[in-house]
Amino acid sequence: MVKLRLKRYGRKKQPSYRIVVMDSRNKRDGKAIEELGFYNPINNETRVNISKILQRLSQGAQATKTVKNILNKAQIVAEKNN
């Protein structure tokens, strides 16, 4: 199953995350199919590619709970509620 997930990067105790499309069976920091944006919880900064996210959701990708929350804060409606 393909999911929109967070992939961690950054330094120790200073996490940053990339919003990526990847298979749910891959490791958290494994190879991603596509990068769609990033999220920095320290600065509360978010940048996303809205058109690609909506395209992936329409193709059947499911967003994780955390990614749904980030998209809701960025005022992008996650259409899939699974």
Swiss-Prot record:
Q: Which NCBIfam families match?
A: S16
- InterPro entries the UniProt entry points to: Ribosomal_bS16, Ribosomal_bS16_CS, Ribosomal_bS16_dom_sf
Source taxon at top rank: Eukaryota
Q: Tell me the PROSITE patterns matching this sequence.
A: RIBOSOMAL_S16 (PS00732)
Leader sequence segment: none
- Cite a single GO MF annotation: structural constituent of ribosome
**Its gene?**
rps16
Q: Which Pfam families match?
A: Ribosomal_S16
User: Could you provide one GO biological process annotation from this protein's UniProt record?
Assistant: mitochondrial translation
The UniProt entry, under HAMAP family, shows: Ribosomal_bS16
* Organism (species): Pyropia yezoensis (Susabi-nori)
> What keywords is this UniProt entry annotated with?
Chloroplast, Plastid, Ribonucleoprotein, Ribosomal protein
Calcium in keyword set: no
Q: Which family does it belong to?
A: Belongs to the bacterial ribosomal protein bS16 family.
Choose one Gene Ontology CC annotation of this protein and give it: mitochondrion
Instruction: Please indicate if the UniProt record lists Acyltransferase as a keyword.
Output: no
What's the protein name?
Small ribosomal subunit protein bS16c
